[in-house]
Amino acid sequence: MDSVIFAAIAVLLSKLLTNNNESPFFYNCLACLFVGLFILTFSKILESAGWLATTTNYIWPICFILIHFYLLKEFIFKNRDISKFKRSIIYLILIITLLEAISSEQLLVMVGGAYLFTIVYCLYKKIEIPKLIYLFIIIILFNFIYDFCCPGNINRVKVVTKLGFPDYANFNIINKLDVGINYFLSWILMAKDLFSVIFLALLGVYTYLISNKNKITIITLIPCLAVLFFASLRFANFTTVYSYFDLTNLKHGLLSLGFIRMLSCGVMYLIITLIPLYSIYLIYKDNKKLGYFIFVLLILGFGSVIISGFTPSLTSDGRIYLNYLFVMIILDYLLVDKILEFKNKN
């Protein structure tokens, strides 16, 4: 069944992100390549709590939400003329896939954010918002209320805090944000996954291309080079320098460090944050829809990790990054498509 889920994710990526009908085989293979790389490179994370437990709790919901947004795009926003029976079936599938997806707390935050950004986009573009969207918003809000008020979740936090991380009880909102932001940025800076490195490289290349190869835009490749530098330190076994910047297992956040180390890591964090934001700004100037979409996906990926600072279980053996990694896969796939599209036009 997991094989079917992974295959479905690859197909849905191709269906959702490309409008190129000339070479569907290439784009399907590209999607399969990214999903296959994910399985190979993160099999240890998938096995950390048991393969079946991890895939059903993390991977299956991703498949469900891709199905949900594919149907939303193809049948709700395009308002296709179909029979009432087929429309009823689609509505039912939309509701079921949404409920299955938001059973995951991380995806609940991401899907809620996705719908918020969708509504903002529709209002800005003066696109009529389908009435069904309001039903989905209500479902999401009820799930938020349930997750935050459920006695079981409240007791679980108390038990995990007491047994696993007593210091968490003294964390204020600044500490929690600090921990979440540090986990996100340190993971990227230390090249803990291949897809973030690919994203930074593709983002720099695409920005350089659309800016008519303006030399100043070469700076957009700096984050990728910085990340590759730390990756080379790890493979060359220069553990002293690498360990100095590696804060991916730091439970108390960046603010708990000494001033010099905090400043050093903070500067690197600014580099891998501000320069990609500059790239996205240039993309937005060239193609507002694409720039907005990339920005939204990055915010959703960021949100999926930052909420780890609001739970005493913290990193959970890397599983907190699984949703973020699929955001990176989507962005990598999209940027490859846009770079090829740009080359074909020019």
What is the meaning of each model-derived region?
Residues M1, L52, Q106-G113, V120-L123, ...:
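Transmembrane catalytic cores of multi-pass membrane glycosyltransferases
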Residues C29-L30, F34-K73, G258-Y278, F302-D332:
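Membrane-interface micro-motifs in multi-pass membrane enzymes
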Residues E74-L98, Y134-L135, N344-K345:
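Short hydrophobic alpha-helices at membrane interfaces in multi-pass membrane enzymes
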Residues L221-C224, I271-L298, L340-N346:
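Signature aromatic-anchored transmembrane alpha helix within multi-pass, membrane-resident enzymes
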Residues E22-C32, S83-I90, E128-F136, N214-L225, ...:
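Membrane-interfacial loop-to-transmembrane alpha-helix junctions, especially the N-terminal start
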Residues F85-V111, L141-F142:
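Membrane-interface alpha helices of multi-pass inner-membrane proteins
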Residues S3-C29, I67:
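Transmembrane-helix motifs of polytopic, lipid-linked glycan transferases
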